């Protein structure tokens, strides 16, 4: 899922 604007985990 999206955590911030550009990175994911």
Curated annotation (Swiss-Prot):
It comes from the Eukaryota. One of its GO terms (cellular component) is extracellular region. GO terms for molecular function: toxin activity. Expressed by the venom gland. Keywords: Disulfide bond, Hemostasis impairing toxin, Platelet aggregation activating toxin, Secreted, Toxin. Negative results: does not bind to GPIb and alpha-2 integrin. Does not agglutinate the formalin-fixed platelets, even at high concentrations. Potently induces platelet aggregation of washed human platelet and platelet-rich plasma in a concentration-dependent manner. It acts by binding to GPVI (GP6), leading to kinases-dependent exposure of functional alpha-IIb/beta-3 and platelet aggregation, and also induces metalloproteinase-dependent GP6 shedding from platelets. Belongs to the snaclec family. Hexamer of heterodimers of subunits alpha and beta (alphabeta)(6); disulfide-linked. This is Snaclec trowaglerix subunit alpha. The lineage of its organism: Eukaryota, Metazoa, Chordata, Craniata, Vertebrata.
